[in-house]
């Protein structure tokens, strides 16, 4: 059975998923009760958990949920918003398709021909979406949205410092949509305390990478207790009991082994021949003596704790008790890796342990004791950290296992979100301008002699060589201020006049200072003259300025912002194209409650109004309208001044008057996470638009290994 892949089919599937997401989105959302295919009942507000619990048969639905899961693995946030935003984009495309439907209704066109024409149309839109995402979207974020950034870091004379209040607002907004109303404040406060206890420095990137990667080993779930009993424990908690526990005082040294300490009769690939019982008993005595010697040597090195990834023979445990050495067996590879990352300790090899030389691979621990949580015994280790992470374990309690698992999932997602927040997000885009070029020879000013430096000489030689060989002219665009006005967001707009304006070096330096560090290194093909370009309106003032090399200060800010020059032949109308790279700095946030969506919609519409290319205009308006669907749902329960129309109009008035926006909700959300969500949804939409045909294949479910083994018997 085959069906045509179309926007209409995808919209029907997405609307079913949207009906689930709408019920639990936002602070006013409720919990959704569903039954898993296994018969287990799930009550949750976590969008990712609900989507993964669905038994989906439609291939488009499975593909959409797979895209959501892939996004959550990176960011840990945005599952419900993903579905809502995608659904609004599909509605917009469906409306576009309905408008152009008349061109395909001729009687002499067969149905399959109309289908392939539609496929070609959607594929062209998919290509336009990809071009817009890779070449334009980052520019709008970098030049317009950046002026509204807030930060979770507080500036002080000592440098960047994480603000606890900002982190609390960020985490409270995050957990508000994932756990019940009765617990989200307690959970967010617990998470905030955990972050500050684990961080040895303010950077946090290394800490959150470790917390994300080793979350299962740093978390302990306990059922049968209220959520309020959840707490933070200093040190590392291993979910197993001691094979041998010997209380120890004073300095406690620890070693890790990954092999059996008791010598074997023979090694792998060889055989040991015994001709008599006497030889066997003699061999047994030698093995016993050798094992005792190894354990005595460990005691002589003040080793009082032995961690092993394999199960040791009873003789090793017996000798450990004689030497007052505690033993913890059967550590997983992940647990061994975590201990190694925290302590910097490498596993001991058997020859080193068996010899009488000093054991180098050992470390001190603060304490080593058993821990009992709800009748279960655990190993509690006080590890001394050699990295930025101070070891602490999280004990999450709940009356039932399902609630504990939901809180564990929410915590893990929060660590992913914070990991991305504390990392700079790269933005890559292209600047394109069209203007009238003067093919006359390039003029040099004598002031170049006064601003002489090796860097400027290097770039002057490049431009001179370009002039002699390719007869090219190049341009350097510098934008004053952190954000761009509406006139700066034009694509390919020709300037009607050029006005020569002398600019002093001090003024040029001031303009360069206005650029953020990540954009101060923009080096385009530059015209060696200073020109102000009018916008055609004699009363309007353009902020785009071309700067000559005699006033150019080359930035050493490598890795933050740069533009690769693209040479164009000198014509009456030349196009300058700069490949720019910038970043969303670590710690950037916006007020929660649709601020990101309203701001991006506003700047996308401003860009669409000044766009000369029709496809970019359509894409900009499509994304802008779809983004507004998210705050509409968030403010749907609100009435009066708190309703969406009032919030939206106040936001527009504030933007037009260059005043700060006022959010209707308290809390913050990560800018990097929201931008990643936007790009992930666009990539999912591109996949949907490239589907021509959906073929359903009915087959028997594959047998598992257990079923096959039973059939064999």
From Swiss-Prot:
Keywords: ATP-binding, Cell projection, Chaperone, Nucleotide-binding. Transmembrane segments: none annotated. SUPFAM superfamilies: GroEL equatorial domain-like. GO terms for cellular component: cilium. GO terms for biological process: chaperone-mediated protein complex assembly; cone retinal bipolar cell differentiation; negative regulation of neuron apoptotic process; neuronal action potential; non-motile cilium assembly; photoreceptor cell differentiation; photoreceptor cell maintenance; protein localization. It comes from the Eukaryota. Gene3D superfamilies: GroEL, GroEL-like equatorial domain, TCP-1-like chaperonin intermediate domain. It is found in: Cell projection, Cilium. GO terms for molecular function: ATP binding; RNA polymerase II-specific DNA-binding transcription factor binding. Probable molecular chaperone that assists the folding of proteins upon ATP hydrolysis. Plays a role in the assembly of BBSome, a complex involved in ciliogenesis regulating transports vesicles to the cilia. Involved in adipogenic differentiation. Belongs to the TCP-1 chaperonin family. Component of a complex composed at least of MKKS, BBS10, BBS12, TCP1, CCT2, CCT3, CCT4, CCT5 and CCT8. This is BBSome complex assembly protein BBS10. It comes from Mus musculus (Mouse).
């Amino acid at each position: 059975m085959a069906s045509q892949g179309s926007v209409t089919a995808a919209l029907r599937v997405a609307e079913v998923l949207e009906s689930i997401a709408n019920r639990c989105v936002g602070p006013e959302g409720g919990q959704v009760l569903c039954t898993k295919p296994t018969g287990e009942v799930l009550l949750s507000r976590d969008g990712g958990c609900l989507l993964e619990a669905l038994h989906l048969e439609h291939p488009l639905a499975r593909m959409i949920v797979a895209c959501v899961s892939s996004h959550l693995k990176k960011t840990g946030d945005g599952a419900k918003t993903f579905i809502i935003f995608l659904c609004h984009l599909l509605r917009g495309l469906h409306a576009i398709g309905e408008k152009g439907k008349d061109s395909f209704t001729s009687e002499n066109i067969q149905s399959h021909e109309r289908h392939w024409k539609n496929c070609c149309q959607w594929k062209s839109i998919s290509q336009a979406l990809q071009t817009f995402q890779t070449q334009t979207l980052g520019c709008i974020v970098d030049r317009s949205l950046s002026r509204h950034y807030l930060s979770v870091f507080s500036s002080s004379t000592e440098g960047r410092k994480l603000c606890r209040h900002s982190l609390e607002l960020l985490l409270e907004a995050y957990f508000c949509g994932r756990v019940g109303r009765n617990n989200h404040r307690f959970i967010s406060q617990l998470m905030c305390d955990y972050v500050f206890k684990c961080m040895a420095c303010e950077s946090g990137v290394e800490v959150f990478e470790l917390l994300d990667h080793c979350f299962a080993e740093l978390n302990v779930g306990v059922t049968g207790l209220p959520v309020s009993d959840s707490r933070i424990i200093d040190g590392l908690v291993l979910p197993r009991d001691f094979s041998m526990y010997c209380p120890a005082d004073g300095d406690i040294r620890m070693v890790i082994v990954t092999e059996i300490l008791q010598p074997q009769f023979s090694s792998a690939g060889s055989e040991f021949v015994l001709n008599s019982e006497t030889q066997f008993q003699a061999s047994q005595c030698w093995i016993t003596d050798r094992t005792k010697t190894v354990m005595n040597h460990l005691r002589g090195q003040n080793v009082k704790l032995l961690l092993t990834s394999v199960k040791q023979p009873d003789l090793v445990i017996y000798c450990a008790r004689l030497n007052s050495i505690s033993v913890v067996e059967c550590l997983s590879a992940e647990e061994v890796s975590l201990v190694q990352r925290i302590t910097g300790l490498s596993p001991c090899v058997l020859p080193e342990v068996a010899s009488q030389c000093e054991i180098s691979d050992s470390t001190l621990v603060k304490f080593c004791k058993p821990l009992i949580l709800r009748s279960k015994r655990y190993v509690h280790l006080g590890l001394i950290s050699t990295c930025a992470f101070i070891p602490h374990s999280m004990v999450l309690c709940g009356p039932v296992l399902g609630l504990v698992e939901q809180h564990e999932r929410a915590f893990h997602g929060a660590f992913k979100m914070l990991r991305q927040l504390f990392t700079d997000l790269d933005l890559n885009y292209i600047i394109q301008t069209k203007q009238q070029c003067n093919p006359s020879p390039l003029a040099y000013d004598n002031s170049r002699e006064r601003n002489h430096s090796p860097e400027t000489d290097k770039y002057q030689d490049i431009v001179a060589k370009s002039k002699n060989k390719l007869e090219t002219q190049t341009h350097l665009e510098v934008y004053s201020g952190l954000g761009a006005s509406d006139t700066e967001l034009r694509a390919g707009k020709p300037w009607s006049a050029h006005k020569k304006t002398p600019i002093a070096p001090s003024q040029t330096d001031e303009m360069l200072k206005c650029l953020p560090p990540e954009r101060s290194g923009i080096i385009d093909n530059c015209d060696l003259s200073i020109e102000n370009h009018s916008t055609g309106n004699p009363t309007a003032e353009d902020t785009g300025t071309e700067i000559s090399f005699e006033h150019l200060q080359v930035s050493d800010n490598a890795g933050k912002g740069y533009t690769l020059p693209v040479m164009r032949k000198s014509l009456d109308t030349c196009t300058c194209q700069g490949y720019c790279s910038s970043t969303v700095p670590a710690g950037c946030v916006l007020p929660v409650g649709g601020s990101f969506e309203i701001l991006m919609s506003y700047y996308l519409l401003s860009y669409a109004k000044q766009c000369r290319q029709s496809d970019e205009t359509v894409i900009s308006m499509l994304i802008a309208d779809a983004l507004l669907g998210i705050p509409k749902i968030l403010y749907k329960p609100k009435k009066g001044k708190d309703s969406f129309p009032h919030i939206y109009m106040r936001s527009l008035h504030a933007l037009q008057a260059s005043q700060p926006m006022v959010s209707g909700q308290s809390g913050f959300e990560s800018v990097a996470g929201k931008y990643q969500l936007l790009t992930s949804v666009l990539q999912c939409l591109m996949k949907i638009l490239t589907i021509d045909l959906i073929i359903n294949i009915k087959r028997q479910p594959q047998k598992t290994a257990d079923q096959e083994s039973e059939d064999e018997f």
